[in-house]
């Protein structure tokens, strides 16, 4: 399997020398990297001008793109309105990703609220299924959904839960943030054996994935 490497957002080193994200593709190519994750964690606010320009720059410098959907998505909220809003945030992310030429969006699942993890997972499955159905209806069938592992115990998103979400649709792929998994398991990762165990679990569930090495702020696609 081929791999692509690149940052999620702009590093301090980049920001110290450059003024705009549109310069990121050239910067990454010069460093020997080939992927960039555009950050919409605080909301999807991407104009056509920026989206189309980034698409052109990424193509010029052989950089593939993904997009991180808003952090405030809550797939398993007890409030139906919040789940519906989460679907809208996902659709907004699909639209922005499509305009800039990205082929996948990274999705946080949110907290388990005051219900069991099993019930939260079922709500999340329903929300993601409805989001995918609407995305396809709106012409975003080419956008891959990538649920991400979460870093806090009260959040839905341990490795098993993320893999369960990805079984909903062939176009769903897990985003595995090892830093998050290590945090939620209180320093579980000690070395190679723990990584191998987690990767074996992923391999048994899906054949292709989106991995994030949290410590270096790099993505492995």
State each model region's role.
Residues 59, 76-175:
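Active-site acidic/histidine proton-transfer and metal-coordination neighborhood
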Residues 5-9, 36-38, 65-67, 105-107, ...:
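Hydrophobic faces of well-ordered beta-strands that scaffold small-molecule active sites
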Residues 150-161, 183-199:
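Active-site glycine- and acidic-residue-rich loops that bind
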Residues 1-95:
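N-terminal pre-domain/capping segments
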């Amino acid at each position: 399997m081929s791999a692509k490497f690149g940052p999620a957002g702009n590093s301090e080193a980049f920001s110290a020398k450059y003024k705009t994200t549109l310069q990121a593709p050239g910067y990454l190519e010069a460093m020997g990297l080939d992927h960039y994750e555009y950050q919409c964690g605080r909301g999807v606010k991407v104009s056509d001008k920026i989206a189309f320009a980034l698409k052109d720059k990424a193509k010029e410098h052989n950089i593939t793109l993904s997009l991180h959907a808003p952090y405030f998505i809550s797939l398993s909220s007890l409030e139906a309105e919040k789940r519906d809003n989460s679907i809208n945030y996902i659709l907004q992310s699909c639209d922005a990703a499509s305009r800039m030429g990205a082929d996948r969006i990274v999705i946080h699942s949110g907290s388990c609220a005051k219900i069991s993890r099993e019930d939260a997972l079922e709500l999340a499955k329903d929300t993601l299924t409805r989001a995918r159905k609407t995305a396809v209806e709106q012409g975003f069938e080419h956008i891959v959904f990538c649920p991400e592992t979460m870093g806090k115990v009260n959040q839905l998103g341990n490795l098993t839960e993320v893999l369960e979400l990805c079984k909903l649709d062939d176009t769903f792929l897990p985003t595995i943030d090892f830093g998050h998994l290590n945090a939620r398991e209180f320093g579980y990762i000690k070395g190679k054996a723990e990584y191998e165990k987690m990767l074996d679990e992923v391999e048994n569930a899906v054949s292709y994935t989106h991995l994030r090495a949290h410590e270096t702020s790099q993505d492995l696609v």
